[in-house]
Structures are given as C-alpha cells and as structure tokens.
Amino acid sequence: MNSNEIKAILEKIKKKLTNQVNKIKNIFIYIIYLKEYLNQLYEKKYFYREINDENYWKKYSNIEIYINGKKIGTSENINKSEYILLDLFMNGPIKININKKDKIYEITNIRKLRYLMLLYLGIVSKINIVFQQITPPTLNYEKNYKTEEIVDNYFVLHVYVWNEIKK
C-alpha cells in the first residue's frame, strides 16, 4: 500500500465517523426537545401554546421545516393563519386538558416526533408542509382532513394537507 491509498482509506474512515457523530449529535438534540416538551406537559393542568409569539417559532429556525415553501422561524412572509394551521397540524388544539390529552397526542405527537427524527437522522433534508384550502377549525379533528407525503429527488418530504370532502 502506498501513501495515497492509506490517505484515501483514512479519509473514508473519517467521513464515516463524522456522519456517525453527526447522527448521535442530532439524536441528543432531539432528546433535549422531547425533554422540554414533556416538562411543559406535566407542569400544568392545561397546556397552551403561544402560536403568534415570534420567540415560539424562533426555536424552529435551525430545523428545515417549511410551510407552503416558506421557512418557519425566520422573517419570511408567513401569515398568522399559516402559523395557526402549522401549529394545529403539528401539535393539536391550542388549549389541551392534560387529563384528556392521550387521544389527541396519540396522532399529533407521533407525527411531529416522526418528522423531527426524519430530519435529525438525515433521512430527509427538508420538510415542506403544504396546506391546500384548509380552514383552521377542521384541523382539530383528524378525520376531517387527509394528508399525502411525497419525497422528491432532493430528499425533501412534501406533506400535502387538504380538507376531506364529506358526501
């Protein structure tokens, strides 16, 4: 083996180790988010979210989540109704009685945590949630809307959400 072959092998090993370290780092970040979330839940009788508070969304600025093609947590032109839709879709109702949270969180938390894990593990590079003619009250009830998830060639997960038409 010559020195160039050894350098190439060492470079491959370095890349693999760097990827593994980044994945572990992302898992720890995910655990910290989860810990903060659980602390908020168990400290209060009711759990409220400040969906219009700028600081609430800034914590998401380092995460590649988009709503209708606009990055959340930044100064892009995301209007109030888009933030409300995003919040209801990812977290459920604004005011939640902790004693009755199980059924609500069964669906919404699994979805939110799954999306965060897909990002943190590098399975997808971005998530773009696209709301198509949705009214906020219907997002409180999972049966009133449908979703379709598509991953494109750039590993962007597009989540399309629309009202289910009742017959």
From Swiss-Prot:
It holds the Pfam family DUF613. It is found in: Plastid. It comes from the Eukaryota. GO terms for cellular component: plastid. InterPro entries: DUF613. Keywords: Plastid. Belongs to the A.longa ORF167/ORF288 family. This is Uncharacterized 20.3 kDa protein in rpl12-rps7 intergenic region. It comes from Euglena longa.
